[in-house]
């Protein structure tokens, strides 16, 4: 984003504006990706910003709010910073050491997170739900509902 101000504008202000417009348009379910460790009281700017977003969203009033909280996103993309490249190479090995309560910090493929977002829309559950590593993996496995075709 270039600066903390720009990061907050993109990751909080624009997401909240979009959520408000969606709610005004009668959208009943909202799915958002934040981060494992998101906390509005965190000292870390990134985690605090994500936590502030999480804290603000329930007040908008969606029937269903699904908060996806992945660890580091891994995978290949066109433009990769050195940090992203290192994560994509070493995180799959590092994941093996992240067990028990630390499992939530495992790196996860961006495609898996995208599938989990779609899966969240298929649960039919109402309320606010947070999903970390295992929950994201489970949501990603929910198959699409069969389409009904006319004719």
Feature locations, PLM:
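SDR active-site strand-loop-helix element
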Residues: 30-36, 68-70
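A short helix->loop->beta-strand "cap" motif at the edges of active sites that frequently abuts
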Residues: 25-29, 61-63
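NAD(P)H-binding glycine-rich loop region in Rossmannoid oxidoreductase-like domains
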Residues: 1-17, 21-24, 39, 121
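Oxidoreductase cofactor-interface core, primarily capturing Rossmann-like NAD(P)-dependent enzymes
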Residues: 40-146
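Conserved internal alpha-helix in NAD(P)-dependent oxidoreductase domains
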Residues: 12-13, 28, 52
């Amino acid at each position: 984003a270039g600066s903390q101000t720009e990061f907050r504008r993109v990751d909080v202000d624009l997401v909240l504006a979009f959520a408000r417009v969606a709610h005004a348009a009668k959208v009943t379910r909202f799915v958002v990706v934040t981060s494992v460790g998101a906390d509005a009281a965190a000292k870390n700017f990134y985690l605090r910003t994500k936590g502030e977003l999480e804290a603000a969203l329930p007040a908008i009033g969606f029937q269903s709010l699904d908060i996806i909280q992945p660890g580091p996103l891994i995978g290949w993309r066109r433009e990769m910073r050195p940090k992203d490249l290192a994560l994509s190479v070493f995180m799959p090995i590092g994941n093996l050491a992240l067990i028990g309560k630390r499992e939530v910090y495992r790196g996860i493929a961006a495609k898996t997170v995208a599938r989990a977002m779609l899966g969240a829309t298929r649960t039919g559950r109402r309320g606010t739900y947070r999903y970390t590593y295992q929950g994201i993996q489970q949501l990603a496995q929910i198959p699409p509902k069969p389409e009904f075709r006319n004719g």
